[in-house]
Amino acid sequence: MGSNLKEIRKKITSVKNTQKTTKAMKLVSTSKLKKAEEMAKRSRVYAERITAVFQEIKAKIEQNGFSGLESPYFTAGEDREVKMVDIVFVTADKGLCGGFNSTTIKEVTRLMAEYKSQNVKVRLRAIGKKGISFFGFNEVELLDKVSDLSATPDYERAAEFVNKATTDFINGVTDKVILVHNGFKNMISQELKVQDLLPIKADAIEAKESLGMMEVEPSEQEREILDQLAKKYIEFNMYYALIDSLAAEHSARMQAMDAASNNAGELVKSLTIAYNKARQEAITTELVEINTGVESMK
């Protein structure tokens, strides 16, 4: 009985230590989530501005007789048969965040199966150790991969990564580029986001209001202007996806650690009850043995 009590005490101590760790991780994730949210807010302001500039210049150029759809960035899907698709996806470098990573991985796997059934080839470009590890373990080839970027979003590195997919699209190597990530919805939920990155859809860059920009004069550089803006638009979408994913990751981890802490608390209560019961039984047994010994001596 004594050894049983010792085992229960060890378990209680172990669970309490785990609970301390999960509580600490929750606090860290809460702090990091706030920082990621601030990054996302600042980025949204920039996103609105670049979208407005993009749309206004595109509209003014079209008024001068240039159709944006002539640009390879805007090539309509129905005018270009889809034979090869690049899927760019973001996962975290770490786990302990519930189903955050598996949600993205499942969607990428689903898209692969869907395109395969249509005889469309798919290439994967992965950001994040969890996604890289999963597809590597399952012997699925990754055309491009990078770690430590999802944990520390950097515009230059994000642009460098996505520009490889953009170049292949412009050169006709691929016919479509899809961006998949698990994004931030609110403090307690995440939202799977699947975006057709290329070709750019006209409705994806509708500006809410005019910026009152100067007129764009007709010139041979019109397409170059629009293409440069399109390139920046793609780069920023990649960068924002990293920030959005980071906020969602910390939100998911905060929830997971909160749930783990609560579960640990319940387990400690259960083990404490078991310990007290075992201790009471041990005391009762000792009393019975003492009484039996006393009776035998009479």
UniProtKB/Swiss-Prot annotation:
Which GO biological process entries does UniProt record here? proton motive force-driven plasma membrane ATP synthesis
Q: Name one Pfam family in it.
A: ATP-synt
Q: Does the keyword Coiled coil apply?
A: no
| Main localization (coarse) | membrane
GO molecular-function terms, A-Z: ATP binding; proton-transporting ATP synthase activity, rotational mechanism
Q: What keywords does the record list, in alphabetical order? A: ATP synthesis, Cell inner membrane, Cell membrane, CF(1), Hydrogen ion transport, Ion transport, Membrane, Transport
- Membrane topology label: Peripheral membrane protein
| Entry-linked CDD domains | F1-ATPase_gamma
Subcellular location per UniProt equals:
Cell inner membrane
* Any one GO CC term of the record: proton-transporting ATP synthase complex
Role this protein plays: Produces ATP from ADP in the presence of a proton gradient across the membrane. The gamma chain is believed to be important in regulating ATPase activity and the flow of protons through the CF(0) complex.
Question: What protein family does this chain belong to?
Answer: Belongs to the ATPase gamma chain family.
What PANTHER family does the database record attribute to this sequence?
A: ATP SYNTHASE GAMMA CHAIN, ATP SYNTHASE SUBUNIT GAMMA, MITOCHONDRIAL
Q: How does it assemble?
A: F-type ATPases have 2 components, CF(1) - the catalytic core - and CF(0) - the membrane proton channel. CF(1) has five subunits: alpha(3), beta(3), gamma(1), delta(1), epsilon(1). CF(0) has three main subunits: a, b and c.
Question: What's the protein here called?
Answer: ATP synthase gamma chain
Native organism? Wolinella succinogenes (strain ATCC 29543 / DSM 1740 / CCUG 13145 / JCM 31913 / LMG 7466 / NCTC 11488 / FDC 602W)
Lineage from the top down? Bacteria, Pseudomonadati, Campylobacterota, Epsilonproteobacteria, Campylobacterales
Gene name per UniProt? atpG
